[in-house]
């Protein structure tokens, strides 16, 4: 085992776990962050897969129609530690096939994560798995590393939570960080609701995965909502057909752009917040005046929920509109000097992991950066000061 392969990088998302080793260009394994327990133990095997009392990740996803599915993470925070440990067991022993006692681990976490959550995570890594050393990195900072930047604003939207995080010279700025509890899972739920209004009922946990696939295949963000609504109403150009697992074919029309709209208008999913465009504008506008130009120039998208076609151009349009109304106060001359650039790297779905793999490779021999096991045994949770 080389030194790099002894450093595990694990990005635990609300929807998916991306795990692998330092220096790799792609996660060694990506699987759903879900735990399933059989509803009925009527048979031992199904579709050549053994039905076990606890099923995790890909195997749970495969048999999801027969299982009671739970997600250990919600809004980026671990809510169920027992299930989280099942997910980590699956990660280390089934997927990566490593002995944690020989390895170091780099974990990721969302900004504004509760301290208790972070302390418990370190405790589990050292006491249950016996890792030699651990490091916890903030996801947004890793995204910028992967993009080759030290300063910028990261719009990180995964399955459970969306964060807008300004990072200056490699340090995230917590006082300017904005959090929006609308992300991929909410878009899927909203799409279920829109399809329900059309008479298609999806209510089991298995159906949730089906609708998620519909969302990933067909949804996009509309640049001009009025135009999209007219197109949906007066023509059939937006209609796409999707074949459900039971063979039924359903048409998807206006729902394609209506579902992701909840990210720009959270009131649609009963969240009291402004949309993602206004949050980015607000966060940059409250930053020091001499950093704003650089922030506007480096708005980096990250996470699976930024993959919708049309999202980068709509975000740019929203930011420019708000700048024109609130900063330029309608002055078209000052708008000519305003530069706003949205960076949408093609591999942004895995940006956090890629940044983690880069950082872990740089740090692997530098003991000063890591929290090691002996320090943890001596100091307890206070050892976290090394990371933050």
UniProtKB/Swiss-Prot annotation:
SUPFAM superfamilies (UniProt xref): Actin-like ATPase domain (SSF53067)
Top-level taxonomic group: Eukaryota
Keywords linked to the UniProt accession: Actin-binding, ATP-binding, Cell projection, Cytoplasm, Cytoskeleton, Nucleotide-binding
A cellular component term, taken from the record's GO annotations: actin cytoskeleton
Keyword hit for Cytoplasm: yes
GO biological process, one term: phagocytosis
Main location: cytoplasm
Compartments, as annotated in UniProt: Cytoplasm, Cytoskeleton; Cell projection
Annotated positions binding ATP: 158-160, 212-216, 303-308
Signal peptide (from-to): none
Pfam families referenced in this protein's UniProt entry, alphabetically: Actin
Molecular function terms, GO-annotated: actin binding; ATP binding
Stored InterPro entries: Actin, Actin/actin-like_CS, ATPase_NBD
Claim: DNA damage is one of the keywords in the record: no
Subunit comment: Component of the Arp2/3 complex.
Family: Belongs to the actin family. ARP2 subfamily.
Role played: Functions as ATP-binding component of the Arp2/3 complex which is involved in regulation of actin polymerization and together with an activating nucleation-promoting factor (NPF) mediates the formation of branched actin networks. Seems to contact the pointed end of the daughter actin filament.
This protein's name: Actin-related protein 2
Originating species: Acanthamoeba castellanii (Amoeba)
């Amino acid at each position: 085992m080389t030194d790099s392969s002894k450093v595990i990088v694990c990005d635990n998302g609300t929807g998916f776990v991306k795990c692998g080793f330092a220096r790799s260009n792609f996660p060694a394994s990506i699987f759903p962050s879900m735990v399933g327990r059989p509803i009925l133990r009527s048979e031992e095997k199904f579709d050549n897969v053994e039905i076990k009392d606890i099923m995790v990740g890909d195997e749970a996803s495969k048999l999801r129609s027969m299982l009671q599915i739970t997600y250990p993470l919600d809004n980026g925070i671990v809510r169920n530690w027992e299930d989280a440990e099942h997910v980590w067991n699956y990660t280390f022993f089934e997927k990566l096939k490593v002995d944690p006692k020989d390895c170091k681990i780099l974990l990721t976490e969302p900004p504004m994560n509760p301290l208790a959550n972070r302390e418990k995570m370190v405790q589990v890594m050292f006491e249950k798995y016996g890792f030699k050393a651990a490091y916890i990195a903030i996801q947004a900072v890793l995204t910028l590393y992967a993009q080759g930047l030290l300063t910028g604003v990261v719009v990180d939207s995964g399955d459970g939570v969306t964060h807008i995080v300004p990072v200056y010279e490699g340090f995230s700025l917590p006082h300017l960080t904005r959090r929006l509890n609308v992300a991929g899972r909410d878009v899927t739920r909203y799409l279920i609701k829109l399809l329900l209004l059309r008479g298609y009922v999806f209510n089991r946990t298995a159906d949730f995965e089906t609708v998620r696939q519909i969302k990933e295949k067909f949804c996009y963000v509309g640049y001009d909502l009025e135009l999209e609504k007219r197109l949906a109403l007066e023509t059939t150009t937006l209609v796409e057909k999707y074949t459900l697992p039971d063979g039924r074919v359903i048409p998807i029309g206006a729902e394609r752009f209506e579902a992701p709209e909840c990210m720009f208008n959270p009131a649609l999913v009963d969240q009291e917040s402004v949309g993602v465009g206004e949050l980015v504008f607000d966060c940059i506008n409250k930053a020091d005046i001499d950093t704003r130009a650089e922030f506007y120039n480096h708005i980096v998208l990250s996470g699976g929920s930024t993959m919708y076609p049309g999202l980068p151009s709509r975000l740019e349009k929203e930011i420019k509109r708000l700048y024109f109304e609130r900063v330029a106060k309608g002055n078209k001359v000052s708008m000519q000097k305003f530069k706003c650039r949205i960076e949408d790297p093609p591999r942004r779905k895995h940006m956090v992991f890629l940044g983690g793999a880069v950082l872990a490779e740089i740090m692997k021999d530098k003991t000063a950066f890591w929290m090691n096991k002996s320090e943890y045994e001596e100091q307890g949770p206070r050892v976290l000061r090394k990371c933050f």
